[in-house]
Amino acid sequence: MPRPENPIQLAVIGAAHGTRGEVRVKTFTGDPLAIADYGLLYDEQGKAYEILEARVAKTVVIVRFKGVNDRNAAEALNGTELFIDRSQLPDEELDEDEFFQTDLIGLEAVDGDGKSYGVVSAIFDFGGGDLIELSEKGKRPMLIPFTEAAVPEIDFDKGIIKVEPHAAGLIADEHDNPPHESGKKPKKP
């Protein structure tokens, strides 16, 4: 299969692991080892990567790719994003509160009054729960928690996510703390 026509990011390659060409991989699959079930993976330029071996080591997945046989070759892959074509995803239905990250990118974030706070430009998980990055032309990107309180509704047909500005930290809280300084920690729904 050539470069995916409708790419879905499945993983990103991290640092080299050991001296035999293995790499650490951050996966975006429910089961981290499921990355090996999709066959060939592709980078943004369309280069194919075949997984020969994958295993979990502590909190990361260690992968050995075909043709990557030493540490230097492994180090050269650091930061490479890996994709599959959307058609390779399982046909099973997603739960109501499950989404493909790629489907959220580009949605406009609006409050109940229709005020725009930018568009979803990325989704991050730094260990404390998912965060949505909102970008607005001429402004610095903002991170908001991806919780039911902060993002109570997602409407793909309208191309929007509804945000609750107080819960998302977009406006001052009841104690007049500036946005993003309320001291509250985001929680996963």
From Swiss-Prot:
Residues 168-189 are annotated as: Disordered. Residues 96-169 form the PRC barrel domain. It is found in: Cytoplasm. InterPro entries: PRC_barrel-like_sf, PRC_RimM, RimM, RimM_N, RimM_N_sf, Transl_B-barrel_sf. Keywords: Chaperone, Cytoplasm, Ribosome biogenesis, rRNA processing. GO terms for cellular component: cytoplasm; ribosome. The keyword Cytoplasm applies. Residues 172-189 have a biased composition (Basic and acidic residues). Its main location: cytoplasm. GO terms for molecular function: ribosome binding. GO terms for biological process: ribosomal small subunit biogenesis; rRNA processing. Binds ribosomal protein uS19. Belongs to the RimM family. The PRC barrel domain binds ribosomal protein uS19. HAMAP family: Ribosome_mat_RimM. An accessory protein needed during the final step in the assembly of 30S ribosomal subunit, possibly for assembly of the head region. Essential for efficient processing of 16S rRNA. May be needed both before and after RbfA during the maturation of 16S rRNA. It has affinity for free ribosomal 30S subunits but not for 70S ribosomes. This is Ribosome maturation factor RimM. The gene is rimM.
